[in-house]
């Protein structure tokens, strides 16, 4: 059971990470930092994590080790996690490549103290890399709806892959992000079509 102090340099603005769901992500992106560690077991909700003291005054990235909003995640699990987080006076970052799932929970009380983020690593679709994730444009359309609803949004362009500038700028802009995070491939054992200049 753990509320982990954030140590990475990608999200320096986050104070902690918290992972009540663990295991294989449906999106199966080969560059995922979790895939490099070991063979992951099936996705599960760790009920013991719903007993962790989340403290107060923290900015917690919930679900940093798997996409807790993927299409195969049971709604009951998401509801349990949101309800639990809402019991603490913190701010939360929820990130997904499937932001359409966010739409089901926009009226949940925890959203009043949350930021919703999606990954838009390129405007292109690389099927062998992005696999089961929704298309970047689909993500941007949903994030536009979320921003119009009044919930703060972020976009993460990581790992940044080759893109078409005008189209990528359009997708990011559609999300009306308060912040854009940009990062490169951190899995040196995986070759991606990264920008060359």
Predicted regions and their residues:
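N-terminal [4Fe-4S]-dependent radical SAM core
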Residues: 1-61, 67
């Amino acid at each position: 059971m753990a509320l982990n102090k954030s140590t990475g340099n990608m999200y320096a603005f986050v104070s902690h990470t918290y992972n009540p769901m663990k295991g294989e992500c449906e999106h199966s992106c080969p560059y995922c930092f979790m895939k490099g560690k070991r063979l992951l077991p099936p996705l599960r909700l760790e009920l013991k994590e719903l007993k962790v003291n989340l403290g107060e005054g923290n900015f917690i990235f919930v679900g940093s080790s798997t996409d807790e909003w993927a299409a195969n995640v049971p709604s009951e699990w998401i509801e349990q996690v949101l309800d639990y987080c809402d019991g603490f006076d913190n701010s939360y970052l929820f990130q997904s490549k499937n932001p359409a799932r966010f739409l089901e929970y926009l009226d949940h009380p925890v959203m009043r103290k949350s930021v919703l983020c999606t990954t838009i690593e390129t405007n292109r679709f690389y099927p062998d890399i992005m696999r089961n994730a929704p298309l970047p444009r689909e993500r941007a359309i949903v994030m536009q709806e979320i921003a119009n609803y009044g919930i703060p949004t972020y976009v993460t362009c990581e790992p940044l892959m080759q893109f078409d500038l005008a189209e990528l700028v359009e997708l990011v802009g559609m999300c009306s992000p308060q912040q854009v995070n940009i990062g490169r491939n951190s899995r040196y054992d995986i070759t991606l079509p990264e920008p060359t200049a």
